Amino acid sequence: MTDTRKFKATDLFSFNNINLDPLTETFNISFYLSYLNKWPSLCVVQESDLSDPTLMGYIMGKSEGTGKEWHTHVTAITVAPNSRRLGLARTMMDYLETVGNSENAFFVDLFVRASNALAIDFYKGLGYSVYRRVIGYYSNPHGKDEDSFDMRKPLSRDVNRESIRENGENFKCSPADVSF
């Protein structure tokens, strides 16, 4: 069994088992702390409920935008390799969507590497679709930068589903065009 609880600053000393994955974006400590300070309700961890709890995954998000662009953004989500296929990522995504609805957001969005087919299929299974392709979003100091898909899922406030579009893979933009 697992427990979902708020992400605490002290968790930063216990999550190496989660972050040691080539597809997991890692950040400096001040970045994590700024999220925990500004958006504490959008940062949670999954933890084993054993006598010696172990972090199994986390999600960090934020609320941003104005007007019809007001949304919840998934900044990071990852699950430790030995805890995958247990439904933890789905639970954390559901949690963030629930908070987004409670904050009256129009949609939830996230960025995913265009080459990460497993993650893209996972998000599509949750109801997300590609809104646009961001050219060179992920920098690579040793080679060619990698594109990202901006994926979105409309929330209950977006009754007309204006936050999504068909064939989003064909709508290309630069990272400079991504602002809310």
Curated annotation (Swiss-Prot):
Keyword line: Acyltransferase, Cytoplasm, Nucleus, Transferase
First-tier enzyme category under EC: transferase
Primary location recorded for the protein, binned into one broad class: cytoplasm
Coiled-coil stretches noted in the UniProt entry, renumbered to this chain: none
InterPro entries registered for this protein in UniProt: Acyl_CoA_acyltransferase, GNAT_dom, NatB_acetyltransferase_subunit
Residues in the signal sequence: none
EC number: 2.3.1.254
Reaction(s) catalysed by this chain's protein: N-terminal L-methionyl-L-asparaginyl-[protein] + acetyl-CoA = N-terminal N(alpha)-acetyl-L-methionyl-L-asparaginyl-[protein] + CoA + H(+); N-terminal L-methionyl-L-glutaminyl-[protein] + acetyl-CoA = N-terminal N(alpha)-acetyl-L-methionyl-L-glutaminyl-[protein] + CoA + H(+); N-terminal L-methionyl-L-aspartyl-[protein] + acetyl-CoA = N-terminal N(alpha)-acetyl-L-methionyl-L-aspartyl-[protein] + CoA + H(+); N-terminal L-methionyl-L-glutamyl-[protein] + acetyl-CoA = N-terminal N(alpha)-acetyl-L-methionyl-L-glutamyl-[protein] + CoA + H(+)
One Gene Ontology term from the biological process aspect of the record: protein maturation
Localization of this protein: Cytoplasm; Nucleus
Matching Gene3D superfamilies: 3.40.630.30
Keyword presence, Cell cycle: no
Record's function text: Catalytic subunit of the NatB N-terminal acetyltransferase, which catalyzes acetylation of the amino-terminal methionine residues of all proteins beginning with Met-Asp or Met-Glu and of some proteins beginning with Met-Asn, Met-Gln or Met-Met.
Protein name: N-terminal acetyltransferase B complex catalytic subunit naa20
Annotated organism of origin: Schizosaccharomyces pombe (strain 972 / ATCC 24843)
